[in-house]
Amino acid sequence: MARPTIYRVAGQRLLVEAEDAWATRAVAALFADWYLDAEGEPAAGDPSAAAMIVRSAAPVPAVPAGLPSFDVAGGGTCHTDGGTSYIEIDGSLVVIGRSGMADAEVWMNGPLALDSAVLTRLVTYALSAALRRRRLFELHSAALAHPATGAGVLIVGPSGSGKSTQAVHLASAGWPFLTDDVLLLREAAGRVEAWPLRRSFAITAGTFAASRFLQARTRFDAADAGDDDKRLFAPHGVFTAGFKDHCVPGTLVFSGLSGGGSSRVSRVSPGEAMTRLIRMSPWSCYDRATAAGHLAILSALARQAAAYSLEAGRDLLDPEASANLMAACAAEAWT
């Protein structure tokens, strides 16, 4: 029996249906790790059309033959006709934007382990597509707020670019935090806002070793680390500066690792910032139904926030040096 549930995310409500008992458990388990708060079954005034449907007991439909295709993260393949997209991973399927269906529908190739990376990837693709159709656009970025002004600082980059390390150091230094990895962009009152998506921080043994603050308050057990050698921890009871549920970004820092001892920072033009944001947001080009809105919010963000390129060296393993550098970027952005 289908179970519809209203979830609140980034100030909006989303109707999600799980069509069997396993799907109900899977959605609840995954959404508990993200800032998606269950509000129960739909009531008067709530969305009546499902944004997303998940099922494990129904046969996986066939993908139409002859569609252009490309590889996507997680070992999957996306087939698309420009309007509808079909994402295949290990025999399971996500269908996005098909007429007469929910915005995103997931067919699992049987029940998967709840900690399966494939399950997480499939539901993430579906959720991201449903959110894009509600003008909530995902960006891989850490986000914190300057402790004096409250202005948002986004540290943008792919996995392994130093986002989590810098987020840990800044939060340890008293910066209120939003997320260390994934956020949602939305437009409100003529400004771009950033809202966190993932609840946990994910750190490597190296980040833990560089943070006396964390060492005094938590532990790193290699046995708890995932396939990417990162361990999740809940930041809310660790960092005293506290959590912010959203911010207005004033500074963008595009982060990468230099491999050297010293870090280098340079100012980036709005045009270059836009290019980098698009590079970090492939669905702004792949998903034609939402591309215009997606590109518009990235453009607005590039104009709203002062942008910097950071080639992070080993000196930023020092928490004080990291906090000082980010504070300097934020201070320059205000002038």
Residue spans for each PLM region:
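A noncatalytic interaction/capping subdomain that flanks phosphate/NTP-handling catalytic cores
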Residues: 1-159, 172-173, 183-335
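Conserved lysine of the Walker
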Residues: 163
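Post-Walker A alpha-helix
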Residues: 166-167
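Residue-level detector of anion-binding/catalytic polar loops
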Residues: 176
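Active-site flanking residues adjacent to catalytic metal/cofactor-binding acidic residues
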Residues: 180
